[in-house]
Design a protein with these regions (language model features):
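Rossmann-fold dinucleotide-binding core
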Residues: 3, 76-77, 96-201
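A short linear boundary/processing microfeature
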Residues: 42-45, 69, 81-82, 150, ...
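NAD(P)+-binding Rossmann beta1-loop-alpha1 motif at the extreme N-terminus of oxidoreductases
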Residues: 1-62, 86, 123-126
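Rossmann-fold NAD(P) dinucleotide-binding segment
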Residues: 50-114
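Short loop/turn and capping residues at structural boundaries
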Residues: 30, 50-51, 93-94, 118, ...
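Small/polar loops that bind or transfer phosphate-bearing groups
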Residues: 7, 28, 64-67, 91-92, ...
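Structural detector of well-ordered beta-strand residues that form the stable sheet scaffold
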Residues: 27, 47, 89-90, 115, ...
Length: 202
């Protein structure tokens, strides 16, 4: 499957590498051209600008943003202005869930799906996979399932396949409508940080 990745920091770059290893076509862009060049050498297709990235994607397009939360809404709006009905924007950063709800509502009249994905796995995700907490329209999430399945850890040897459990045993879950993915990630982070603080006081 083809996907565009914007933001090639440690997590974004490693997510591209994981997708390339599993046969996906990745079109990549970053303000730092060196980050783009490094992934082109590993098999990705480089883009010189956001517009170039969009031009190199086939409809229906999917653009995944791995950016700091402070700039994500601005960049998402810039992409939405250039995308078409049926395309999707995925926010895999640590954005506030209410912003995801607002952006989804803003883009919906344009026919553009906005999917928020809480992404957990850090720099180890390249080998171990990423736990994904997904919010957004059912049809759009289903269309992107091959991407989510490739990024996720997989069931592992000790978890029996059970269709009734859906994708959860494989490390990714459609949590609900817009905002649900980032809301669940916020809860996840709160628990994680609470445990770390508690252990520090032991």
């Amino acid at each position: 499957m083809q996907i565009g990745m914007v933001g090639l920091g440690r997590m974004g770059a490693n997510m591209v590498r994981r997708l390339l290893k599993q046969g996906h076509e990745c079109v990549v862009y970053d303000v730092n051209a060196d980050n783009v060049d490094a992934l082109v050498k590993e098999g990705a297709t480089g883009a010189l600008s956001p517009g170039d990235l969009i031009a190199k994607l086939e409809a229906p397009r999917a653009v995944w943003l791995m950016l700091p939360a402070a700039i994500t809404p601005k960049i998402a709006r810039e992409f939405a202005a250039a995308l078409n009905k049926g395309d999707a924007i995925i926010d895999g950063g640590n954005s506030f869930y209410r912003e995801a709800i607002d952006l989804a509502g803003e883009f919906s009249p344009l026919g553009i799906d906005y999917i928020d994905v809480g992404t957990s796995g850090g720099v180890w995700g390249l080998e171990r996979g990423y736990s994904l907490m997904i919010g957004g329209p059912q049809a759009a999430v289903k269309r992107l399932d091959p991407i989510f399945a490739s990024l996720a850890p997989g069931a592992g040897q000790n978890i029996a396949e059970n269709a009734a459990l859906g994708t959860a045993p494989r490390g990714y879950l459609h949590c609900g409508p817009a905002g649900a993915g980032h809301f669940v990630k916020m809860v996840h982070n709160g628990i994680e940080y609470g445990v770390k603080i508690g252990r520090a006081h032991v």
